[in-house]
Structure formats: structure tokens, C-alpha cells
Amino acid sequence: MQETVTTSALLDPSHSSVSTQDKSSTGGHTSSTGPQPSKPSITPVSAKSRNPHPGANFHRMRRIIAEDPEWSLAIVPLLTELCIQHIIRNFQNNPILKQMLPEHQQKVLNHLSPDLPLAVTSNLIDNENYWLRCCMQRWPVCHVAHHGGSWKRMFFERHLENLLKHFIPGTTDPAVILDLLPLCRNYVRRVHVDQFLPPVQIPAQLRPGDQSDSGSEGEMEEPTVDHYQLGDLVAGLSHLEELDLVYDVKDCGMNFEWNLFLFTYRDCHSLAAAIKACHTLKIFKLTRSKVDDDKARIIIRSLLDHPVLEELDLSHNLIGDRGARGAAKLLNHSRLRVLNLANNQVRAPGAQSLAHALAHNTNLISLNLRLNCIEDEGGQALAHALQTNKCLTTLHLGGNELSEPTATLLSQVLAINTTLTSINLSCNHIGLDGGKQLLEGMSDNKTLLEFDLRLSDVAQESEYLIGQALYANREAARQRALNPSHFMSTITANGPENSVG
């Protein structure tokens, strides 16, 4: 009997308590009728003395914890894990990464701190997940699509932009930016700076006895307001393709002064020299910076015969006819494809200069002159140029005081031009008759896809019928995109002389 109890206790620990209880209960009371079938009686055990059943803790009984990526059955960490932890802790002093196996590299990168010095990580780590963590730690909103889809490029571009926006000439050490260039030169392709701070100068208050004998205050030296000079920066970025600048000051508060918003001649000459020497620059934007005719011509002169420049944006400035003439000269001395002079002071003479250049141009595909004042004289000149131009696809003339004479000539353009796909004449005075003229021109046009005539005094019927013609053109363009082979076979069958539309 004892042997049976012992064996059952080894096989089933829960049964041992029952057998022991049976033995203790029968030891004190001997049955007079002889041995009887034993009826085990279980005495309640107090909660304090109750031992938990091993199966009660389900987590302890599981052999694999799949939801824990760090779980390991081994009680002692593997030597490789200990080495990886040591490398992570001492990565700043001894950056070991390339010599490791790929799976070990990934473990190290997943646990590296985003606060490591850029001198250690910039040219060593290319893993996008690491730079994703660096970006998300610094900026709550991240549009990686604006940076070519690369988190590493985004980090260095925004980090450099942040340094430039808070650089104070005469106060900030230029080495802060210059030391960064060797680390980011291979990754920065776009620089967008919407603020340039002027020098911090506390003007000395004159006392009554401090004035000169003549009493003139003109001998006082004017405080300089030149901003950070971009020459060294642009020269150090060997892959720079886009430069987007705004000489402005944000959040100036009670320290507001008009000279905080000056784009000085020294700034202009320095910037012109920098972009002239940058032979990789494709897009240049200088907006909302109070650029007048003289400064615009300095900038444009530096861009003549630029090898790769494709887009120039000088919108929201103070450029007049002289600046527009400089831009017209640039059209035929560059590979410019997009020109934006919106919200400036260009009038009819400037528009005529642009029209003369446009008539012989073979590169420009987009011209934006909205919110100027070219009037009908300038609008008619542009319409005449479009009768011979074969490359422009987008024309924006909104808010230019245009009226029926310009609409009449544009209707003739619509009948013969086969390259324009978008025209904007909103916020003008086209009128009822002008709308009818444009509708007549649209009846022969098969390529225009967008035509904005809002707030131009065109009759609703004319606007509706023009919209129907545009819808037919868009549907035909969609069919051509879906079946290009069928479209080409139709052109071949009809001959090139009937291929228009």
C-alpha cells in the first residue's frame, strides 16, 4: 500500500495530498468491521497554505511566447547577445557595424539611440528605419515625399534648414554650419529656408552732449542688416538641385522693424555669385523678399546660360518691366521650362518683352503672370506669340485687367494652337462678347483640358458650353492614354496632315 501511494504521488502530485489525508484519517480510527473501500476525504486547505497549481499560471507553462520578440528560453544570454549589447552601449566610442552579420547589424540599428552625434552616424548608417526614428523624434509632422522618399535625406535637409533659419550674423558661429557640410553634402538635394535673421545690434542711445557740433545725425553709421551669406554653403553642397529662399522674419513680436525684412544688395550679390557657381541647380525660388527690378536683374544675369536650370520662381516681389525684360532675355539664354512672375508689378511693356521672347522659344512649358497688370496691350502681345509658339502648355493670366480684345485674339489662338492644355483668365473683364468669342475658338480646339473663367463676367451659357468642350477633350485624352497604339495607327492611316486632335 505504501509503495502504491508513493508511485501515484510521483505521477500525480495532486493525488499525494489526498492519499496522505486518507492515511492520517484512518490511523486514528480503526474500523471494527475490517477493511472497507477507502473513501478519500479532502480536508479544505487554507488560502495561505495552498500551493498554486503549475497549470494555473498559463504564462509559465507556455514553451514559446510569440508576442515577445525578445523572449528566449535560455536562462543565460547568448554570447552574441552580450556582444551586441556591449556594441550598442559603446557605439559612440567604437562604431562597429559593417563587420557584423546582417541580422546582427539589424539588432544594433534597432536599439541605437537617435541622439548619437552626426559625426558618427552620417556616413556610417544608411538604414532608413534608423533615420525614420531620428526624424520622428525631432519633428511631429514629417512629409518624406517632399524629400524624395528618403528619411535620411529628410533629416539632413531639415536639420540644415533649421540651422540656417536660426543663424544670427555676428552672433552664431559660422562653424556650426560649415562643420555640417562634410557630413550632409552627399544627401542634401533641396534647401528651403523661409526665414533669415538679421544681425542683433543694440543701437546706442545718444545723450544730449553726444551730437556733433553741427548737430547733424547723418554722420551716424547705419546698422547693417545683411543676412547669412550663402556662398560657402552652396559651394559645399555638391548635389544641390533646388534652392527655395524667403528673406523674411517670423515671430518678431514687439521687436518689429521694417529693416528686418530687407533683402540687401550685399545679400543679392552674394546669392547671385552662389547660384552662378552651382552647376547642379535645377530649381531656384526667391519669393516674398521685396526683390525690385535692380536686384532681379542681378539675379537673372547670373543665371544666363546656366547649364541645367529648369524653373525660376520670383513671385510675390516688386519686379516691374525692367525685371521682366531681364527674364525675357533669360528665356532664350537658358533651358528654362517654368517661369513664375506672379504678384509683381509687370505691366504692358514687360509683357511685350516676354511675348517677343516667347514667340521664338522652344523650351518654356509654363508661364505664370497672375496678379500683375499687363492689360489688353500685354495680353494681345502674348496671344500673338502663342500663334507661333509650339511648346507652352500652361498659361496663367488671372487678375491682369484683361478684357474683350484679348479674348478675341485668344479665340484665334485656340483654333490653331495644339500644345496649350491649361489657360487661366479668372478675375478679368472678359465680358459677354468675349465669352462668346472664346466659345467659338473652343469649338475647333481638341487639346485644351483646363480653362478657368471664374469671375470674368462671362455668360453662364458660354461658360457651360466651354465646360462641355473641355470635358470632351479630357475624355479623348483619356482614351488616347488607354489605347496609345490605336491612336498612333489612326494617325498613320489618316496621314500627318490630319493628325491634329
Curated annotation (Swiss-Prot):
Residues 24-34 have a biased composition (Low complexity). Coiled coil: none annotated. InterPro entries: DRC5 (IPR052410), Leu-rich_rpt (IPR001611), LRR_dom_sf (IPR032675). Residues 1-23, 35-49 have a biased composition (Polar residues). Keywords: Cell projection, Cilium, Cytoplasm, Cytoskeleton, Flagellum, Leucine-rich repeat, Repeat. This is Dynein regulatory complex subunit 5. Its main location: other. Residues 1-56, 203-222 are annotated as: Disordered. GO terms for biological process: flagellated sperm motility. CDD domains: LRR_RI (cd00116). Component of the nexin-dynein regulatory complex (N-DRC) a key regulator of ciliary/flagellar motility which maintains the alignment and integrity of the distal axoneme and regulates microtubule sliding in motile axonemes. May play a role in the assembly of N-DRC. May be required for sperm motility. Belongs to the DRC5 family. The gene is TCTE1. LRR repeats lie at residues 308-321, 335-355, 363-383, 391-411, 419-439. PANTHER family: DYNEIN REGULATORY COMPLEX SUBUNIT 5 (PTHR24107:SF27), YNEIN REGULATORY COMPLEX SUBUNIT 5 (PTHR24107). GO terms for cellular component: cytoplasm; cytoskeleton; sperm flagellum. Component of the nexin-dynein regulatory complex (N-DRC). Interacts with DRC1. Interacts with FBXL13/DRC6, DRC3 and DRC7. It is found in: Cell projection, Cilium, Flagellum; Cytoplasm, Cytoskeleton, Flagellum axoneme. The keyword Cytoplasm applies. It holds the Pfam family LRR_6.
